Amino acid sequence: MKKMFLFLLAFVAIVAEAQTKGNFEVLDLGSFKLHVYNTNDALGDASYIIEGKTGLVTLEQPLFKDNVSEFDAYVVSLNKPVQKIITDYHVGGTGNHDVVMIEGMPDFVKGTIYGGMMKNFAETFGNAIASMPTGKIEEIPMGSTQNWNGVKFSFQKGASTDFPAASIIIGNKVYYTHWTPVKSHVSHLQISSLAAIDAEITEAERALKSGCEYFIGGHGGAVKKDMVEFKIDYLKTMKRIIAANKTADSFIAAMKKAYPNLPGEAGLADLAKTLYK
């Protein structure tokens, strides 16, 4: 896992650039609404608002100041109180507001991997990102189910090779994990080993079995189950290709042949370097 986040530190140094503000979309799920905020920031982050009848729960608030301002203004426009602020995989610009985190994540955030990543963000992006949060942290037990604004939030262990954060089932209709499944080649930041492939397959199969209607992530927006099915098939195909190819170059060629014109081809070289060390 440490190798993957060292790659991330190098990655952010390359993608630092002027930002385009984000956009919102709203999904009406009957008993609650899911507001999806695609930040369009340099990290491809997404943030969410779960709107119940009497209040709001925010999830993975933005990190960049322009996005924080835009997100906060949108929250105010909903004219409902924010009951909980969930920080799961991504520490955001929550200021001095109290937040909810899965047990163990507050210590992990202070550690060398996550703490080093946030320090690098500060050095790379400077004043463009918000200061580290200073609010009180409420730790939620892994495996617990919370009921906020009449919506159930079930916290379960995420992919074993990722941060020690949680996948969250929201209202039995939305499944949140670190990376939204998309029809694209995976990043070397997500898959850094054969063990990571297996862990992501296990997590995706668990998501599919949840019966949820939408699948969301800290990177990417909201998708339906066909994207989860694609991810599972893609990763299993990747495992077979790795077993059949002994070099990075032959792996890249085989992946391109298996998925012609699939977005993300440019990232296959970095992925191959990671997998064929």
How should these model regions be labeled?
Residues 54-55, 65-108:
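Active-site metal-binding motif and surrounding structural segment of the metallo-beta-lactamase
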Residues 4-13:
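Sec-dependent N-terminal signal peptides
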Residues 16-20:
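Boundary at the C-terminal end of the N-terminal hydrophobic targeting segment
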Residues 21-24, 28-29, 63-64, 109-233, 237:
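Metallo-beta-lactamase
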Residues 21-77, 166-179:
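Conserved beta-strand hairpin/beta-sheet module of binuclear metal-dependent hydrolase folds
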Residues 112, 116-118, 209-214, 221-277:
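Accessory terminal helices/loops
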Residues 57-60, 84-86, 154-155:
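Short catalytic-loop micro-motif centered on adjacent basic/acidic residues
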